[in-house]
Amino acid sequence: MKELFELINDNCKYVVLRNWEDVYNEYVYGSGGDDIDILCEDKALFIKLTGAKRLHGNIFRDNYFVAFGRLKVRFDIRWVGDGYYPTKMERLILENRKQTEEGIFIPDDKEFFYSLSYHALLQKRSLSDKYLFKLQHIFNSTFPNPYVLNEEIILNKWKEYLCDNQIKITIPNDPAVIINWANVKKLGYEKNIMRLISRFWYRFILRINSRLKH
């Protein structure tokens, strides 16, 4: 795994979006383990360098795996312009990235706060205590004059961020990514008809398949 990251470090602009502390731990990310969440500038280049293969037949899904001998490590490969985050935000994350002592590129503290809070508030059905605790820790160490966070306060921080950077929330290209519509509508979003249709059909087919199995 270390050799893989050394290769992409030299050839491809990327970050590991979260949970990078255990990236080299095969018990966490080995076969059947967690996914490594990647944001890269050039998805085709990342796939070419790593030899990543699709996990699913659906071309809109961004789930891949890379084989390391007997291990198959799963990657969720996000890329600039895919709507997983707003495009301008994806560029900011990559432009402001930093490198860990282990040689892995990750978001800087400010972009990590916003990327993780986006994931926790807009890509989960509800804000969990686990994410709130982590966001509070990042907030305390990153922003001046920190205070106690809750969902409403984080959404207000997001309204400021969107206004300051002239960004709109986007619909992800990957139809399997959860959208918390209640929170998305509070912030407003950039409408993309094709992605909404793709999402509708993906959910429809899932329901049909589920009924057929029963």
What are these regions (language model features)?
Residues 1-47, 214:
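Active-site nucleotide-donor binding segment shared across nucleotidyl transfer reactions
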Residues 11-16, 48-63:
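Short secondary-structure junctions
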Residues 187-214:
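Glycine-rich phosphate-binding loop of ATP-dependent small-molecule kinases
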Residues 79-197:
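Catalytic cores of NTP-dependent nucleotidyl/adenyl transfer enzymes across multiple folds
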Residues 34-36, 57-59, 93-99:
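Short, low-complexity, polar/charged sequence segments that are solvent-exposed and flexible
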Residues 49-56, 73-75, 110-117:
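Low-complexity, flexible helical/coil segments
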Residues 54-92:
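Conserved catalytic core of two-metal-ion nucleotidyltransferases
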